[in-house]
Amino acid sequence: MSLLMHGHDWWLRVYKLVLIILLIAMKTFNEQVYDIVARIPAGRVATFGQIARMIGRPRMARFVGYASNNKASWHLPWHRVVFKDGSLCGPGFFEQQYRALKSEGVKFTRDKKVLIEQFQWDPERDAVPMDIRDFPLVF
């Protein structure tokens, strides 16, 4: 019996360790997402999948969306992140996102989808200067 309990304890510890590792990895993932979203220039949009690919996680577009739900990231220009077909996000945010993008000069189709071919952000073409804090100090 004690061997079984010891085995259960061991699995519980492994489970907790795996959860901690996943939480650390997710925090790093979210921080990478936030860094990219912060660099999307006005008048340009990026897709959830594009952001996921930029951080080397091409199958995690949905998790880019989850990252937007974190209150710590609400100061970021999430209105510049759209679906791959140019559709705007959810009903609660749709009109606000539409007005914000329109005020930045983004053009839409008749059914209010971003003209993605014309306004999708290309980081190489639309380079945004990095903050001096992004560079390590070298002595």
For each feature predicted by the language model, list its residue ranges:
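Short, positively charged and aromatic/hydrophobic N-terminal segments
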Residues: 15-22
